[in-house]
Structure formats: C-alpha cells, structure tokens
Amino acid sequence: MNLLKSLAAVSSMTMFSRVLGFARDAIVARIFGAGMATDAFFVAFKLPNLLRRIFAEGAFSQAFVPILAEYKSKQGEDATRVFVSYVSGLLTLALAVVTVAGMLAAPWVIMVTAPGFADTADKFALTSQLLKITFPYILLISLASLVGAILNTWNRFSIPAFAPTLLNISMIGFALFAAPYFNPPVLALAWAVTVGGVLQLVYQLPHLKKIGMLVLPRINFHDAGAMRVVKQMGPAILGVSVSQISLIINTIFASFLASGSVSWMYYADRLMEFPSGVLGVALGTILLPSLSKSFASGNHDEYNRLMDWGLRLCFLLALPSAVALGILSGPLTVSLFQYGKFTAFDALMTQRALIAYSVGLIGLIVVKVLAPGFYSRQDIKTPVKIAIVTLILTQLMNLAFIGPLKHAGLSLSIGLAACLNASLLYWQLRKQKIFTPQPGWMAFLLRLVVAVLVMSGVLLGMLHIMPEWSLGTMPWRLLRLMAVVLAGIAAYFAALAVLGFKVKEFARRTV
C-alpha cells in the first residue's frame, strides 16, 4: 500500500467534505446570522460532538484499532468477526444509555455546559429543546465511526472519509428547504444533524459486508478481546475527555461574553479545521492502523520510518497553511460568511478568533501524528498524563487572555495548548526511545522556512492589489480568493523546487 496515495485519497474526500461544510456554514450564516438562535444550536450540536469524539473517534478508536489490527494479523477472520460482534454490542449498549440519559437531562446538561444561557429564559429553553433532538446523533455517529474504524483497518480509507459529506448534505438541504416549515426555523438544523447520523451509518454498511465484517452486535462481558478494549478505553476516555473538557470550559467562558461569541468562535474553528482535518485527521486515520500493524509484526524500523514520514509531511503542509491562514483571515471570513444577517462586525470578530487559532495549527496537526505513536503500542497512559498538564495550562491561559482579548483569547489558548501538547508528546517519544528522527531534518526545515517567506510575500502582494473583499457577489469574492490562494501555493512549491526539494521522496513510503 502506497501511503501517499492513500493519504491523497483520504485528504481529497476530507477536502470535499470540508468544502461542502463551508458551503453549509455560509448558508447557515446567511439564513440564521449570528445571534441567540445560532448560539443555542451550536451549543446543542457541540455537546453530542464532544461525546462522539470521546466514545467513538477518540477513546474508542485508540483502544479498538490496535487490538483489531492484532486480531486481523494473528487470529484469523472468524475470531475477528466474533471480536467485532462483541465490541459493537458493548458500544451500542453504552451509547444507548448515554443517549437516553442525555435527552432526559437536557436542561441540567445546559446548566452545566453553558450556564450563561440561564440568564435568558428563551435562549435556555431553545438550547434544551435542540439538545433533545441532536442527542441521538451520538449513538448513530458512534456506530458509523465503529464501521469506519474497521474499514480503515482493511485499508478502505476513502469510504469513511466520504461519510461526513452526508451530514453536510443533510444540513444544507434542511436549511434551504425545510427551515421555513419549522417554528423556530433553527429546529430544522437540529433534525438535520440526526438525519445526517443515520445517513453516515447506512452508507457504510454495504462496504462492511463486502469485507465480511457485517455482524450483529452481541453482548458478552466475558470475551477476552472485548474486555481488553474496555480496559484500554478507561485511560483513553480520560485522555480524550481532558481535551474535550477544555473545549467545554471554553464554551462556559464564551457563554458569559457578548452575544455571538460562541458563533464567532465556531466559524473560526470551522476555517481552522479545514487544514487540520484535510491533513491532520487524514494522517491520523492512515497512521494508526499502519503503525499498529508494524508494531504487531515487530518491525520497529518500519514503525520509525512511518513516524518520520508523517512528521515531515506535517511540516511540509502545516507550516505554510498556518501562515496563510493568518494572512488571509480577513478575506476568508468576509468571502465565506459576510452575507445576509452575518454583518461586517461578525466577520471582524470571526477574523480575530481565526488569527488566534492559526498560531496553534501546526501543533494541532502534529499531535495527529505523534499521538498514534503511543496508541499503536497500546500505551494510552502517556498521552493522558500530557493531556492533563495541557488542560491545566489551557485554563490558566484562558484566565490571562479572556480579559484583554475576549473570545479571541479563548482561541489563542487552544492554539498555544496544542503546540505544548505536541512538544510534550515528542519529548516523550524521544525519551522512551520510541522514535528517532531520520537524517536531514535541519536542511529540510530551512528549505520550508525560505519557501514560506516567499509565499508570504506573494500573498501580501496579491492582497495589496485586490479590491475591497466585501464588494461583489459570493462567486466573485470566491474567485478572487481562489486566485490569491493558488498564487500562494504556486509560489511555495516553486520556491521548494528551486531549493532542490523533491516531492517524489514522500511517495516512497509504503507499508
């Protein structure tokens, strides 16, 4: 398997999903603006997403994929099918309980996670109503993530990567065509989330059948393999919960700020997630099963080469992305969101949060490579300890930054914390002699810095000659933005080529 081809496939699917996600956000911003209704929806949508990351894509994948890779490599197909059946049964049971409890306790959940909303009765009631509708998404998307983890282990990377597109399609359809039939209209977005969860699960099931892993969930509290996953999930849930608790605390802080703050941070986060998702999530998706297979087979040299390949690719693409995100923060927010009820002030506030987020983009992406280095070895405790340290320092930074920088201070805390997290993970990988960098890193980084400086000059020059970004229709703004972005990309890779960099070197990494 050529890792670069697999990464390109996953990244292209992820990019398509993110572009569609931007279209979704632009439509939502245009129809609903940034105010009480959108703040209520984003909180109601964020909470199921946080739990989904804890139970499904986060803790569950970290515990499940390395053991699944071991079963696939050593136990045979029949034993693997039984293992999948028992694990899916336990996951379904646990999440069904969480879903029902969350729906019943929605008002109390809001009191804890967004206490500032309690000061406005209408806002609090609307958020509770929306949360009851979106909570089943946890169960649906977690089962979809289980199916995706199995498909990834069988190297069917593009299928799970495409699935999130269906959520965006659902939300766009409901926003455009169903919202007028709901009272209030924002209820349409909540129902779109649940329908999107159903679509993502159903879409992947035929592909699971093709690889012979479509089995009925069964409950067995005594199966050795399933209990290993449960045992690993304990520290994994703690580790992932720490990072999600940090986001919840940020929401609590933001709920006390000016109306619209939650929405401004959400839109900035969506823009920041484009490069982190296209590269970071795609790399993590490919590296976890690949590293797990290398570890299970005892091939430490291949394991080390995979880590080095992933890190170099991170810096190759994340460094220019972070700089470009900061330089283009204004044109991005205006071109994508400043329409209808989304005002110039909303765009400016979103831009400030985006600049703050861009500081930590490299850290956010590098973590996606470094963390699987531990998870693939079934070592979850080390990242957990680092996550706890990061959480404490994040909240200290929140207290320091929220006064002078408001919502942008919360975004800056997340970015700086991501860089700290990545630094500590790297330090532990070196300290435990798990990873040794390959030769040539200094020359590699020097070329990147020079190329980024060239790219920055081109971007600033292009912005100088462009007319005001708020002028013209959305297609015209996006065409101008695309021209600037393409000029920056061309300048960056042209500079690398002049400096003797060969992209072909990355295509040689296979597993």
UniProtKB/Swiss-Prot annotation:
It comes from the Bacteria. Changing R270 to A/C: Lack of activity. Changing R52C: Lack of activity. Residues 33-40, 110-123, 179-185, 254-263, 338-346, 403-409, 464-477 are periplasmic. Changing R52A: Decrease in activity. The keyword Ribonucleoprotein does not apply. GO terms for cellular component: division septum; plasma membrane. It is a multi-pass membrane protein. Pathway: Cell wall biogenesis; peptidoglycan biosynthesis. Changing D39 to A/C: Lack of activity. Residues 1-5, 70-82, 155-156, 208-223, 293-302, 375-379, 430-443, 500-511 are cytoplasmic. It holds the Pfam family MurJ. Keywords: Cell inner membrane, Cell membrane, Cell shape, Cell wall biogenesis/degradation, Membrane, Peptidoglycan synthesis, Transmembrane, Transmembrane helix, Transport. It is found in: Cell inner membrane. Changing R18 to A/C: Lack of activity. InterPro entries: Lipid_II_flippase_MurJ/MviN, MurJ. One of its GO terms (molecular function) is cardiolipin binding. GO terms for biological process: cell wall organization; glycolipid translocation; lipid translocation; lipid-linked peptidoglycan transport; peptidoglycan biosynthetic process; regulation of cell shape. The chain crosses the membrane at residues 6-32, 41-69, 83-109, 124-154, 157-178, 186-207, 224-253, 264-292, 303-337, 347-374, 380-402, 410-429, 444-463, 478-499. FtsW (AC P0ABG4) is also proposed to act as a lipid II flippase. The identity of the lipid II flippase is controversial with conflicting in vivo and in vitro results. Involved in peptidoglycan biosynthesis. Transports lipid-linked peptidoglycan precursors from the inner to the outer leaflet of the cytoplasmic membrane. Belongs to the MurJ/MviN family. NCBIfam families: murJ_mviN. HAMAP family: MurJ_MviN (MF_02078). This is Lipid II flippase MurJ.
